[in-house]
Every structure is written in C-alpha cells, then in structure tokens.
Design a protein with these regions (language model features):
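Extracellular glycan-recognition regions
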Residues: 1-211
Length: 211
C-alpha cells in the first residue's frame, strides 16, 4: 500500500469486522459439476459447492454429466440455497425430467414447507404456493412435455408478479404476495431429475423503476 502523499509503502493488517449483502445477487451462476470440480468421478457423492445447499430430498448429489442429481420418493423433495435477503430475482436451470409426478424450481423459500414452486406436471406448467402441508395453485397453463425431455426453466419473481418461462418463452404467470423474499432451488415430487447449471439473477423491480 502506498501513502497518499509521498508514495511510501505502508505495511500492516486490514481487519474486516463484518461482510454481508442485501437483496438478491446480481448474478450467481453455477456451471457443470466437472467445471467446478475437475477431479469429480461418477462415484463422488459430495463437494464443497454442494454443501452450500440445504436438502430435504432423499438423494442430492453432484452429477457427472450435468450439475445435480436429485430424487425423492414422496412429494416435496426440496433443495435450496440463499438467504432471506433474496427478494426480486429469476432462478434458472436446464432440467431433464425423469419419472416423477412433478418437478421444477423453488423461489422465495422460507424453509422447505413455505415457498413458491414452478413445475411441469401432467402436461401443465404450474406455479403454486406451498404453506406447510397445503399446496395452492397460483396459476397453471397447458405445456406439452414428455418424460426424459430436457427443458430450460426460468422462474421470475418481481414483487407479487410470478412467471415461469420454458425454453425462453413464458408458459404461465400469476400474482401472489404471500412470500416476498427467500432462497431458491429445486423441487421434486415422487421421482428424479438431472439439473444442468443453476443461475440466480437479480432483477430491477418495476416498482423501483417507477420511483
């Protein structure tokens, strides 16, 4: 470190007393597992980056060819990361749908029994609110997909406005203001998925743009 006036070097220590953030990250992106852990093998069951997530799913592991392998034998197998500071954002991943009742993305999670879900189920795109054991549909629309299809899902939350895009096109949207902040991740109902990549990106709320 150089002095401001004479250019002399100053040696010493800098102590950071606290470090935090507010709001959702500008862009938090995870690539494929092999990009993040080049030493990964098909038998690797955990990594340092996997430990940044909390899982209530039966199985949550790094996948050798994508990023995550997630399975759960019953409804509501949830995996999340993030904090209560995450408010207006979009969460995105490329998901391969295997045999399951429903699967997709989670946002604004306050634990694994209170969150918004955006899933593909029974030829429909569905946005729902999970509150304890009760699941309430916010909006749904027809969406053609087959078992073993791979689709890019993006779940965007801007204030009370919720929308799910499939392969870059809005599939369903609705409004609810029960949850205004919380973490993001995945949900699997009675089945399994592969998830290739994971991105959380802050969005500028329309309310802020008007101010």
């Amino acid at each position: 470190m150089s002095g401001a006036a004479g250019g002399s070097r100053l040696d010493g220590s800098v102590i950071i007393k606290s470090l935090d953030w507010s709001g959702a990250p500008e862009c938090y992106r995870m690539g494929r597992s092999m990009e993040m852990t080049p030493t990964l093998t098909p038998w690797t069951t955990t990594t340092s980056w996997l430990k940044t997530f909390v899982s209530s799913a039966d199985h949550f592991c790094p996948d050798y060819t994508t990023t995550f392998s997630i399975s759960h034998a019953a409804p509501n197998g949830v995996v999340t990361t993030g904090t209560m500071d995450w408010d207006n954002y979009s969460v995105k991943s490329v998901i391969t749908f295997s045999q399951q009742d429903a699967a997709g993305l989670v946002a604004r999670a306050k634990g694994h029994r209170r969150y918004y879900g955006a899933v593909l189920k029974d030829k429909k795109a569905v946005i729902y609110k999970q509150c304890d054991a009760k699941r309430t549909v916010v909006a749904e629309a027809a969406c053609d997909f087959e078992i073993d299809d791979t689709r890019e899902l993006a779940f965007t939350l801007d204030g009370p406005r919720l929308s799910l895009a499939v392969d870059g096109k809005t599939a369903v949207s609705g409004q609810d203001e029960s949850y205004l902040c919380g973490g993001a991740g995945f949900v699997v109902d009675s089945g399994a998925i592969l998830a290739d990549g994971f991105e959380v990106k802050r969005i500028c709320s329309r309310r802020n743009k008007k101010d």
